[in-house]
Amino acid sequence: MESYNEYELISHSKLADCTMFIVDMVYRPMHLHKELELCVVLSGSCRVSTDRHGVEAGPGEVLLFDAGSSHELCASGVPARLLTLQISNSFCARFYPQIRSIRFGCRGLSACLLPERLTALRRAMLLALRAYLRDTPEAPFACMAQVNEIFAILLSDTPYRVLSDTENMTQTRNAERMHRILHYLETHYSEPVRLSEIAEREGLTQTYLSHLFREQLHIPFQDYLARLRLEAAMLLLRQSDTTLTDAAYACGFSDPKYLNRSFQKNLGMSPRQWLQENRPDPSRAPSAEDPRTAQRILTPDECRALLDALEIP
């Protein structure tokens, strides 16, 4: 199956500049976002693809994804349980402005950190989550104290580079532009969409936008749009008794034959063959995070129970 990237939107409603959760993940499509992300594999294992590289992550591994770094996660067998921390680039910018420009050179941190430092990092993540879940006046300070400890470990023990002002400005501008474009595609894929129209909206030439799309997402614009429509059709077919023809038109294909071709190209089978293996199940409601994602975010009570079982104070 060809990979693609989406631009993941992350809100910081619980604590400024910081989001934490535990997720049981089967599959997370290739995506990118403006936040730095750390994931501790609590149980299970997963294959992590970052652009053209892959990492196998088992229990205890800590994964690091830079802001703007595309990545895909696929569990090996049973769902992988991940403790996730997402930090916006505004974190500690007032007292350490370089943080906006730092890019780390390691994805699986077991390859970069000594065992005792990796253990300290995992514990700081768990303590940060414990504080994050508390609704008390001191909780945000306790959480951010652990986040500061995490960054102290990363900056002292893992390789990184500092982007130049020009590189940083270019990455930020491109990230904001891709956010607008991908949000537009996410909300208009069922309609006729042309690269020329989006280029005009962005004040770019069609050639420049086509190049930017390939550079940022490693896939041509039309292939990305077709993949977006295919995944929407797969979701619709899996969760209802919609016919193939109706699903094709509802998801933006101008002719059902293009849906057939997309199935063959990306999955190596016809829609009917795929349906035999994925019979409609209306009970499989889409995730609140992403309707095309096979994952479940644990509730706060479930997270607390897990921390209790791990004897995290």
Describe the residue ranges of each PLM region.
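Short, Lys/Arg-enriched, Trp-marked, Pro/Gly-tolerant hinge/linker segments that flank
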Residues: R107-R117, Y132-C143, A152-H183, T187, ...
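Conserved metal-binding segment of the jelly-roll/cupin
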Residues: A57-S70
